[in-house]
A protein has these predicted regions:
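Extracytoplasmic beta-sandwich strand-turn segments characteristic of Greek-key/jelly-roll folds
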Residues: 30-38, 68-84, 162, 185-208, ...
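Extracellular/periplasmic metallocenter environments
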Residues: 92-97, 192-257
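N-terminal edge beta-strand
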Residues: 133-167
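Extracytoplasmic/periplasmic beta-strand context in beta-sandwich domains
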Residues: 138, 181, 227-230
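Flexible loop/N-cap segments at domain edges
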Residues: 176
Length: 257
C-alpha cells in the first residue's frame, strides 16, 4: 500500500472515529436535554451528507477544470435549477418542522405568566399571585451575584442550591432583583432568563438523583463568573421529609445519595 493511500485510509478512519465520538452521548437526564440533543443529531445527520456532496462536487470541478484554458459560460438547464430549488425548499422545511416540534414542547416552552408590576422587594410575596401549574414549584430569585430559592409549600429557603424531587414535573418561577440574569443548567438542557419586575417559567423533570451545575448565562456585572449554584435532585420521600424538617428556615440541601 502506497504512502498516500495509507495516509488517506488513516484520515478516513480518524474522521469516522471522531463522528462516532460526536454522536455517542450518555443518556439524557431530562426531557429538555433529550429533545435538544435529538434535534441537534437530526440536523447533523441531514447536514453531513449534504456537506460531503457539496465537497465532492467542488473537488470534482477543481480537478476536472483546473487547467481549462478556454472556459465557456454555463449553459442554462431549467431542470437542474428546478431540482436544486426544490431540494433546498425540502431541506428548509425539514429544518423548520424539526425545530418547531421541539420549540412547542411544554418542557421547552412552558406557558408563561403575564408580566406584573406588583413585585415585592422584600421577598417572594408577589410569587403568590402566579397561576397554579400543577407541578412542584420552586420560586427562584437572581441577584448580584447569587441564586435564592424558596419552596412555597413549606416556606423553606436555600442559597445557591435548588432542591427538587426526582421523577416529578417541576416548575421554576424566576425573577430578578437588579439586572437580567439567566438560569442555565447545562446537563438538564434548561435555560431561562430572569428579568427585574417580571416572572418567567422553566419546566423540567429529572430522572435520577444527583447534583447538576447551575450558572448564570447572562453577563450581570463584575461578579458574574462567581454566580454559580447547583440543582440537587433527591427522591420524593427525601424531598418531602426535608421540607417538613426545615419549614420556615434557611436550609442546606439534603444529600442526594
Amino acid at each position: 500500500m502506497s504512502s498516500r493511500r495509507r495516509t488517506t485510509v488513516a484520515f478516513v478512519a480518524a474522521a469516522l472515529s471522531a463522528l462516532v465520538a460526536l454522536t455517542s452521548t450518555v443518556a439524557a437526564q431530562s426531557p429538555n436535554r433529550e429533545l435538544i440533543d435529538g434535534l441537534e443529531y437530526q440536523l447533523l445527520y441531514a447536514a453531513l451528507p449534504l456537506t460531503l456532496f457539496v465537497l465532492m462536487i467542488l473537488i470534482y470541478a477543481a480537478v476536472k477544470f483546473h487547467d481549462n484554458d478556454d472556459p465557456q459560460p454555463t449553459t442554462e438547464d431549467p431542470a437542474l435549477e428546478i431540482t436544486w430549488t426544490a431540494a433546498t425548499a425540502i431541506i428548509l422545511l425539514f429544518v423548520g418542522l424539526s425545530g418547531y416540534s421541539v420549540l412547542v414542547n411544554p418542557y421547552i416552552s412552558p406557558s408563561q405568566a403575564i408580566d406584573t408590576d406588583d413585585r415585592s422587594q422584600e421577598g417572594f410575596d408577589s410569587f403568590q399571585d402566579l397561576p397554579d401549574t400543577g407541578d412542584e414549584e420552586v420560586h427562584v430569585r437572581g441577584y448580584q451575584w447569587e441564586w435564592q430559592a424558596t419552596y412555597p409549600d413549606a416556606n423553606v429557603t436555600t442559597e445557591n442550591q435548588i432542591v427538587i424531587p426526582a421523577g416529578e414535573d417541576v416548575t421554576f418561577w424566576l425573577t430578578s432583583d437588579d439586572v437580567i440574569h439567566s438560569l442555565f443548567i447545562p446537563d438538564l438542557g434548561v435555560k431561562q432568563d430572569a428579568f427585574p419586575g417580571d416572572y418567567t417559567r422553566a419546566r423540567t423533570v429529572v430522572d435520577e438523583p444527583g447534583r447538576y451545575d447551575v450558572v448564570c448565562a447572562e453577563f450581570c456585572g463584575a461578579g458574574h463568573s462567581r454566580m454559580q449554584g447547583e440543582i440537587v435532585v433527591v427522591d420524593a420521600e427525601t424531598y418531602d421529609q426535608w421540607l417538613s424538617e426545615n419549614e420556615g428556615t434557611v436550609a442546606e440541601a439534603p444529600n442526594p445519595d
